[in-house]
Amino acid sequence: MKQEFRANGKLLITGEYLVLQGAWALALPLNKGQSMSVETIEAAQLHWQAYSQGKLWFEAIFNNKLNVIKSSDPAYSQRLQNILNMALKQDSETIEKMLGVRVRTELEFDPRWGWGSSSTLLYLLSTWLGINPYKLLDLSFGGSGYDIACAGSNKPIFYRRLPQQKPEIEEVTFNPPFIDRLYLLWLEKKQSSSSEVKAFLQKDQAQPEAIEKINTIGCAMLRSQSAEAFGLLMKQHELIISQILRRPMVKELHFSDFDGYIKSLGAWGGDFALINSPLPNSALCGYFADKGFHTLLSLKSVML
């Protein structure tokens, strides 16, 4: 018997960092994600194979106590073992599902891009084992859970999760008339989401005024019918988060002479930035290549 599951990647458009304190966040599920198949084998073991863009990059075998028998990457097998044990904390009977199977995962995007390699894994595991993915997130990587919501959504979402409460998820439509001038620029430095989450929560207190402003900006961006108005909202959002983090805005840092608007996405300092510009694709590619950045994607091409 073979079971198959799939999870969408994610992109956070508004609310980065403050979504951890209960801000509403606009997030997009992506057409690239991660799939998982579970197939029965004779041995009372868990045989795990992980592929990335068609290539096997990790393989491990766990015994009936979930101890590692064999592994191609001891550090990752330890990390995976911890997640599986966290799943058992929710429901000890899931051990019966974990044994006597071969699990194969297939990541569809470059893991350096920060599109949800961890969140899609948690969602897939939770769907297979029949447990709560948000609880598994809390026990493992931590975070707001918007990425878990994107993993199982077929539409853009507004997402909020207040402390000690269940997530609030509202499906929305995001297809502005100027979407053809929105792009994603990879800043070529993978940020650790879990590390950023921990650092932010350790040093920052709640920001009620900033949260209210970000909520208003997110709603306005969703309704915006003008590329210029949308760009000004991007700029306002960037300024608020910049002041909270005490970090320079990405446009100030790398692209001060750019004709258009640029907003950081996700963990600042790496991952992707949102580009809003009237320049044609060829001119944009040339400009960013001259700055040392070579991966530019249209937003429309990655949205689910």
Predicted features by range, described:
Residues 2-8, 19, 35-97, 105-106, ...:
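C-terminal nucleotide
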Residues 31-33:
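Extended active-site and interfacial segments that coordinate phosphate-rich ligands
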